[in-house]
């Protein structure tokens, strides 16, 4: 996993790096715009939604949500990413913090209609993902959703095939989602495949839950 200084150094070229990978339809960012677009459209179905973005980066998605009337909260590991994102949404509540250690205190005091994470939670181990998702679910409003856009696969076999095809480009420090395995802990998890290596996972909190 990148440390904070490495994340800060990557911040300046992040959007460019993503664009090259997506245009070439290559791992890891094939389908990137469609992933973000799917999450954006889902959030827009609820007017004036309260949204928490985990790993907001340069604010590509978060700023669009902000511009369209959402109340935005966010946490990112990189101080430089926060500096780049904050001017795009001056009234948003953005914090620096390592979410492998959980949410920063001010974010724990809120409930959200949507908690979104795009290409960020793969920095957690599988065990950390399970624990973190359970915590996040408790911070949803009734009827709320966790929306995760990331490198993700329906099966372990599909992941291994992508690893083989990617060769030296594969990042062994990142831990990607395998839906069939995650569903053992979260049977109501939904998955929309976007590209051969990406998709949107959604996990809700029932309207009757309080």
Question: Model-derived features: where do they sit?
Answer:
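Class I (Rossmann-like) S-adenosyl-L-methionine-dependent methyltransferase catalytic domain
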Residues: 1-43, 58-106, 147-210
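Short catalytic micro-motifs in class I SAM-dependent methyltransferases
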Residues: 119-120
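A short glycine-rich, Lys/Arg-flanked "PGG" loop and its adjoining helix->strand segment in the class I
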Residues: 130-142
């Amino acid at each position: 996993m990148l440390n904070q200084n490495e994340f800060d150094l990557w911040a300046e070229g992040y959007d460019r790096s993503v664009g090259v990978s997506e245009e070439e339809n290559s791992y890891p960012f094939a389908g990137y715009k469609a992933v973000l677009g799917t999450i954006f459209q889902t959030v827009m179905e609820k007017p004036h939604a309260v949204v928490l973005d985990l790993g907001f980066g340069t604010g590509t998605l978060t700023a669009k949500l902000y511009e369209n009337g959402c109340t935005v909260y966010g946490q990112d590991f990189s101080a430089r990413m926060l500096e780049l994102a904050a001017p795009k949404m001056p009234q948003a509540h953005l914090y620096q913090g390592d979410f492998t250690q959980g949410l920063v205190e001010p974010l724990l005091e809120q409930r959200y209609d949507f908690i979104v994470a795009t290409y960020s939670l793969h920095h957690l181990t599988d065990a950390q993902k399970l624990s973190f998702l359970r915590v996040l679910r408790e911070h949803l409003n009734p009827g709320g959703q966790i929306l995760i856009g990331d490198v993700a696969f329906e099966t372990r076999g599909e992941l291994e095939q992508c690893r083989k095809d990617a060769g030296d480009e594969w990042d062994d420090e990142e831990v990607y989602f395998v839906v069939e395995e995650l569903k053992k802990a979260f049977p109501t998890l939904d998955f929309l495949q976007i590209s051969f290596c990406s998709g949107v996972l959604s996990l809700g909190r029932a309207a009757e839950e309080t």
